[in-house]
Amino acid sequence: MKTRPFISRLTLSAAATLFVSACATAPTPLSYFDFGPATKASGTAIACELPPVNLPDISSPNSLESNLMLYRLLYANDQQTHAYANHRWSMPPAQLVALRIKSQLANDPKSPVRLVDNGLANPDGWQLRLDLTDFSQYFSDATHSYAQLQLRASLLHANNLLAQTTLTQQANTDAPDAPAGAQAMRVATDALITDLTGWLCKQPHP
């Protein structure tokens, strides 16, 4: 009879230890990032007239088909890709870039590029095929990094290739972490959209 209080105290102590242990090992919640709302165009507008542009979905390699936030340590092993454990993009990178292109151009009344929805493709317009080949954060050392994306753009008309180019943009981060990488990637993507528009304006009309 006298041992019951001792056993009860032992049981409560064990339960408390398990509770504290469970709290200590609880997984950190994931943080998700996108590019935020479209921004108004700044700087000098690109003056040119273009036919309607059909933009299918952007393609990407298998390594970019998930929503993992990738980075490389150039000072350690630049051939190895890493992924942040507790940070994710809100959607795969190719979808993020496609959405940004459409929202940025639609938000800019001075943009010469008139995108056509996939379901309403204009056979007389241009076909713009984009392949996302890089979308990563690069660390030059433990405290400095930059975001980089690269697109291969192919311009077609009536299934004939008119022009092709590779566009690359980088933006430095203000901190060596995932949130700063996401912010820098947005800056780099917006700059690349400007480059893409300029490249399209240089192409002769079919």
Tell me the role of every PLM-derived stretch.
Residues 2-12:
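Bacterial N-terminal signal peptides that target proteins for export
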Residues 24-95, 204-206:
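A structural "domain/chain start" motif
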Residues 26-42, 108-158:
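Surface-exposed short loop/turn segments
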Residues 82, 90, 94-97, 103, ...:
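Acidic, proline/glycine-rich low-complexity intrinsically disordered segments
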Residues 102, 106-110, 197-205:
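Sec-exported extracytoplasmic/periplasmic mature domains
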